Amino acid sequence: MSIANLARRVVRALTPYQSARRIGGKGHVWLNANEAPQAYPFTIEGNRLNRYPECQPAEVVNGYAAYAGVNPDQVLVSRGADEAIELLIRTFCEAGEDQILICPPTYGMYAISAETCGVGIVEQPLTACRQPDWPAIADRLSDVKLVFLCSPNNPTGDLVGRDGLIALLEKARNRAIIVVDEAYIEFCPKASVVDLLARFPNLVVTRTLSKAFALAGIRCGFTLASTEVIAMLAKVIAPYPIPDPIAQIAAQALSPMGLELMQERVAELNKQKALIKTALTALPCVREVFEDKGNFILVRFVDSAAVFAAMKAAGIILRDFSTKPGLENSIRITIGYQNKMDAVLAVLRDQPVSL
């Protein structure tokens, strides 16, 4: 008997999530993982490392609650938003019985987490306008425990319509939990739906420090929800999920100075995003530029394979989405500082008109 035969059936059949780092590649301009273009220095004190950390570091919880405009008992800190996704599925879904609903094309970890937990997946594709199909989702509420929506959506960059979300939350009361993934919300903060937590106990919002806060390397995420939901998740989360050095860095990032740095970074990246979007729309090798509410732009090219190969040859690593339904010939470009965006445009301007 092989070791593989000892593994759970769902794990043997599982195709792991193809993260940017797993896919890899060789280059010097990395624009494939929606990371911030620059790290910032933080200080760490090591005199507490002999002790286990707090399960939920108070300084981080209180800091994020103040930043997000919620009460501290509505916040759970986790190892990235990915752990928050998995915690929600493990907490609310029975393996082999329950299902989640996703709206592809969207972030892949919703499905991977469900598969790993032995939970079924209902796919309700986005509409032609790249919005959730609200009536179709409402019709499936009796079949699912959790509905995952990404706003801004990765990879298309679209925001979830607020009116449609409110109507769905009303219909889902006491039936299903609606999860809104706001990993990129700092790039369009007025579009946040956190304010709806006060009205809907079945709403959950997930957040992260990986994008606008430039802290992808520390894996720190947040769940914002009703106190009842948070209490349930707290039963399931590991006893010491946040290492003390991570908590120290997160607390500094959430300080007044840290928030100011984040907002300055977001303003600069949004500026670069507007500039490259304008430039992209004028290029003959570009067929469509998608919505741009995150720190990335999805672009449909005349021939994405040729563009991807040319970028790779130039040492520029992007993320290919051309195999995803409805995203034929599409590549996602992470927004960086001007020199990186100029490098991308230089390659595209050299592409033949008749690709």
Swiss-Prot record:
Pfam families: Aminotran_1_2 (PF00155). NCBIfam families: hisC (TIGR01141). InterPro entries: Aminotrans_II_pyridoxalP_BS (IPR001917), Aminotransferase_I/II_large (IPR004839), HisP_aminotrans (IPR005861), PyrdxlP-dep_Trfase (IPR015424), PyrdxlP-dep_Trfase_major (IPR015421), PyrdxlP-dep_Trfase_small (IPR015422). Its EC number is 2.6.1.9. Keywords: Amino-acid biosynthesis, Aminotransferase, Histidine biosynthesis, Pyridoxal phosphate, Transferase. Pathway: Amino-acid biosynthesis; L-histidine biosynthesis; L-histidine from 5-phospho-alpha-D-ribose 1-diphosphate: step 7/9. GO terms for molecular function: histidinol-phosphate transaminase activity; pyridoxal phosphate binding. The keyword Amino-acid biosynthesis applies. One of its GO terms (biological process) is L-histidine biosynthetic process. Belongs to the class-II pyridoxal-phosphate-dependent aminotransferase family. Histidinol-phosphate aminotransferase subfamily. It catalyses: L-histidinol phosphate + 2-oxoglutarate = 3-(imidazol-4-yl)-2-oxopropyl phosphate + L-glutamate. This is Histidinol-phosphate aminotransferase. Homodimer. It comes from Aeromonas salmonicida (strain A449). Its cofactor is pyridoxal 5'-phosphate. It comes from the Bacteria. The gene is hisC. CDD domains: AAT_like. PROSITE patterns: AA_TRANSFER_CLASS_2. The modification N6-(pyridoxal phosphate)lysine is found at K211.
